[in-house]
Amino acid sequence: MDAYGPKIGVMHMMGITICAVGRLRQKPEAVLVSNYVDRFNKLGRKLGFGLANLIEVEDKNGSGISAEAILLEKAIPKKSIICVLDENGKTLTSPNLASFLANCRDNSKNNVTFLIGGADGIEEGLKKKADYALSFGKMVWPHSLARVMLAEQIYRSATILLKTPYHRN
């Protein structure tokens, strides 16, 4: 089987969820995230993916990282592969992320959920429950930009799997 193409006869539609602390509201980053998610959703069905979506959680009491972890955990769809975004996580190339998503889909995973913490990151207990930890490099990024970067990489993954000219090596 080609890691970049859907299996013949694949009927399972694997969802992709981005769960993030805080709300972008009407910030420019919200427009970018929405744009990339919409673009992925238009291509994803051709590849056997369900819809990608963004779930934003907000600790209105300001209780901190532990309260954020509880809200994030409640937002994770059942039977989901959990990937935390963390500066100490594994760095992947764009084609590697595309292969990862294709492998999850081909192994009939229900959903892949990416978790993005707030200003203090993700609570250690929740990190330990994750199946994977991914990083955008050793630099720390604001959670609003991390959402944009992740949404773009998910869309880019679809373009890689479909072999469109969007991604150039």
How should each PLM-predicted stretch be described?
Residues D106-L115, G137-H143:
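Short, acidic/small-residue loops that bind anionic groups at enzyme active sites
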